[in-house]
Amino acid sequence: METAAPFVDATAESGIDFVHVNGATPRRYLVETMGSGVAIFDYDGDGLPDVYFVNGAAVGASAPSPGRLFRNLGGPGGRPVRFADVTERSGLARGLLGMGAAVGDVDNDGDLDLFVSGVGKDLFFRNRGNGSFEEADVGLNDPGFGASAAFVDVDRDGFLDLFAGRYVTWSPEDDVRCAPDGEHPSYCTPEVYDGESNRLYRNLGGSRFADVTREAGLWAPDGKTLGVVPLDADGDGWPDLAVANDTTRNFLFLNRSDGRSGPAFEEAGVERGFAFGPSGSPRGSMGIDVADLTGDGLDDVVVGNFSQEMSAVFRASERGQFLDDAPRLGLGLPSLMTLAFGVLAVDFDGDGDDDVALLNGHIEPEIEALQPLQTYAQLPALFRNLGGGRGLEPVAAAGVLAEPLVGRGLAAGDLDGDGDLDLVATQNGRRALVSRNQSPPHAWLGVRPIGRRSNRTGYGLEIAVVLPGRTLHRSLVSGRSYLSASEPLLTVGLGSADAVERLDVTWPSGVRQRIVRPPIGRRLVLFE
């Protein structure tokens, strides 16, 4: 192995000192081991990505610790970045037994709003546009077991709707006690719980949402969802939903909306090859991401799975079918023994090909007593894309990514403005980590979309970056990874190219734009 993108530990220098509260007790409540996520987004509109951490709590805690928001104080051009804790003055000092986060401009006012999923309640924070948030009841609160969520304009009306993942039917009173060997208490696997249907909330114009799950064809109580990512799986211009379920078949919801009669979906995971792995059985799936990993212009889907179940790369075909090709592509066997929560498919080394990161960690602190070959803290895994459809190869990491972690949430963003993607990772019951990308200087292109007919955030935007001899395809989507939200911008490494011939843009509304020889080495603000 050789080091890929040279990540260094920037946690101490960043000033980020978040430690996740999991509320763990000898009782081993299921919720203790599942959280939590992280969101990277520019909350105050100063052009610098900030970081919000979702926090957990002890079951029944009367005053749960709030999540924490860290403001980016600058450090552009690759210099060290410092953050300051602004939780109290931001209006986000509200505690819950939190799980995941999603960000998006739901009212198209130019400011990114925040949704936080939790167990027993969800929270929505409206961005006031002055560096602060207000908690708002907009119809997004559900008493279930919240998981990953994604803002996505499913009906293409220009307003972001919300797909809220739901895990299992659970309460403290119904928590099951497990001891696989009859001696050591352990966290139960989800097979002992009933599933819970996900929710689709339709945006009614920026100030209210309505639950349209059933009428949209998304009611599926047999799912046990932990991850979700939007994508256009069948190339019809409408956003579909790939859903990672834990020990039940994965879902692929194809969008059958017509723009007139409301959202409509058809579940097609089995017939499209996305429901199961090569054995034909469901797996314990957690994190999920989408990217063109083979260079054919089609979105492939990466799914992180439980230990002793290889993580998956569902390779897309032009016919809209998927095939888990992880073993042939090089991600299968290296991921067999680890338990992958956070999953990202992004270009770490700036060569133009999306690579893969798996943030690993077991759910059971004493797993070694039950399975001697397993460990609670596990090494993250980085895979470099060899390009040209040749697959992925595992590479040695550096910094905190070379240490065993109890990994959960993983998000990417250009924290220091130098044109490559840095990583922020959460651990269950442990400190969060900031990994700064110190790749050698390379050409890059950034895109910050501002929708007009489309949703203002630009979720669903697709771009083709045309270079001499190759074309790079990227899409901007919410969801991704596990319980987390990456910076809602596009950062594209250009490899050895020193210029872009043209940038072809397709907006969610269907509007197309072409920019000839766009400037590189900077972020373009792109208006629809």
Named regions from a protein language model:
Residues 7-9, 80-91, 132-140, 207-219, ...:
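Blade-edge beta-strand/turn elements of extracellular beta-propeller
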Residues 68-72, 196-203, 254, 315, ...:
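Beta-propeller blade signature
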Residues 16-37, 63, 90-102, 139-150, ...:
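Repeat-based blade/solenoid architectures
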Residues 48-55, 109-118, 162-166, 239-245, ...:
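Hydrophobic beta-strand segments that make up the repeating blades of beta-propeller
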Residues 35-45, 71-72, 97-108, 112, ...:
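Beta-propeller blade termini
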Residues 3-6, 13-14, 24, 28, ...:
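Gly/Ser/Thr/Pro-enriched helix-cap/hinge segments flanking short amphipathic alpha-helices
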Residues 86-103, 117-154, 164-191, 195-197, ...:
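Asp-box/WD-like beta-propeller blade repeats and closely related beta-sheet repeat scaffolds
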Residues 54-64, 166-193, 358-375:
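Short, conserved, GDST-rich strand-edge loop motifs in beta-rich repeat architectures
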